[in-house]
Amino acid sequence: MCLSLHPSTRWRRRPPCRAIVICLLCLVGLAGGAGAQTRRRRLDKPARKPARSAPAPLQRAPEVPQPVGSALAAPLRVCAGGDVTLGTNLDLAWERAADDSMRRVYGLSPAPDSLARQLSPLFAGADLALINVEGAIGDGPAPRKCKRSSHSCFAFRQPTSTAEALRRAFDSTTQVVGNVANNHSHDAGGEGRETTIALLEQAGVHVTGVDTLATPVALPSGDTVAVLGFYTDASTPDARDLAAVHRYVSRAVDRWGTVIVTMHLGAEGPTAQRTRNANEIFLKESRGNPVAFADAAFNAGATLVIGHGPHVLRAGEWHGDRLVLYSLGNLLTYGPFKLHDPTDRGAVACATIDSVRHVASAELRATKQIWTGVLQPDSTARAFRLVDSLSALDFPETGVTVDSTGALGRRIPRSAADRTPR
């Protein structure tokens, strides 16, 4: 029975028809409330609107949680690279010039498959490949960020075939993870970001950096590890909120045991090679404190932290048997970049995580971009010397060493006398 309060404050029965309507509305309201409660069960992961014209993501079998105390069944080989942009469909002036040079000078096509094939040898032997997807993926009208006549506007939207090209670039047994927690995933707007996520997932690429929940990755060994991406923005897990970083990583460790963290933060460009324990500013924006971020992630139980965002190589540092590489630089960036030393140098980092979740060994594979979208192994191994020297400068006690083969080692601590100020 539906009742209403009469102006005389006495309860009166409503006419039957109106009562039925009001009751139905009450039921709808209750159902809506129940739906709202269901949606609130995952407070840290707001529901995403389905993207227009984007394929539905593939359904995967649920991964099995790994208790914290359990060991990995087999060593895990992780290879990670920095920023990757596989082509563009924005039809800007720089793109037309770059396409012409690629075809005339290098005999290459700017199509995503052609670009992505250059990544394959750099990730050989990886059980898990991790890259930063620097830009949106989609089609349709171009975003308004750049004018068609632009030669230096940094907006990236890659063709829809990019997602499948990225997956095909790696061995079928390699689990591929793409990070979208970065400052260019919104280059086609919020809807474009949703389309990017959907296309990657449909292609079989795991996506991280979408929200505060780690991305579980099931491995052929039967193990499941998790990857969690951060950027300095409220629409992604915010790397500047260190208490939240600790909370999200700790939650992932409790559930999955082995957690790999990727961070897109720090100032950008040739003057941003140094890593200091301080908040970094770029274009008047706070880009976070990479050192404090890594500390928070390791204190929460992360095994490996991979950095990108500065577009240059930075130092690496040991935290006991765990490892952070603060920036791997540009890997394969098809865009209006000025590619000269040091922005043309990058590296793929490969680390072996043993059964007790320690980094047993690690190495760098040096790369060089000789033209936008044209990548080759760096025979001069410039990346090795850069990372080694930057690590000595920024972390003289805990920084990595890099030998002539790219293998990462530990520094011999200076004696107390050597550390005494003179």
Where are the language model's segments positioned?
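N-terminal secretory signal peptides that target proteins for export/translocation
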Residues: 1-14
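Acidic, metal/ion-coordinating pockets
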Residues: 6, 37-422
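Sec/Tat signal peptide C-region and signal peptidase I cleavage site
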Residues: 32-35
